[in-house]
Amino acid sequence: SNNWIGSYQAIKSEITTVNYNPSLAWKVNDKVSLGLGISYQTIDAEMTSAVPGPFSSSQLKGDDSSWGWNAGALFTLSPAMRVGISYRSAVDYTLEGNANTALTSTPVKADVKLPDTAILSVWQQVSDRWEAMGDLSYTNWSTLQNLNVLSSNTGVQIGSEHFGYKYAWRIAWGAAYKATDAWRVKFGIAYDKTPTSNSDRSARVPDNDRIWFSLGGQWNGGVYGKVDAGYAYLYLKDADINQTKVFAPGVTSTLRGSYNDSAHILGVQYSNGF
């Protein structure tokens, strides 16, 4: 809403990325497989907020495209155990677009670097019907400290968004039960550490540590493909915020409060091999 109490900090925050990722895999031997991919990514971003004075609100919009890469390895330690490692590179963008108010539109640009991620995963066949899996992931969110918006014409900074993110990690464990040759039941839990802190938390991303609870199933139709369906409940710790935004000397806005968030996620996937 344009009229909520924190509108001077944020009204709308939207980032959309699309990733095209052709990849190659090489089976070195029965124990080791390697993979390598190239990523071409597009990004579109929009941020709006209220501003003091006659303009009432401002809008920042920008887009760009860039390249990255990813690599991985899978080690078959035994017929009942596999270990995988993977890495996805950071991606650098220079967003270009406009800063808009009711009366003006200024060409702007901003550099942003989305983080690199490393994942270690383990799969274990426990019995004929049970299998267990887990993973530990590290994301280098420290690449995102400030989003400095510059005039494309003069190079002068005309705005800034502070994030102050730190690296974050996630640990997950799950299991699957093979009820029949066609049906499997899956469940899992994960702890996801936030990259922000109480001192840096913003109204744009009022994030905190998260716990995931998930439940799902798979139907294997053989030549007809596979259908997966799942549900996840996402619990977030209450997130306190104390953010002051400076518009000009002596002109500030402060938001103090607490966020209470949760989410319900449903997903369906169909896959087939040729």
Where are these regions (language model features)?
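Outer-membrane beta-barrel porins/channels
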Residues: S1-F274
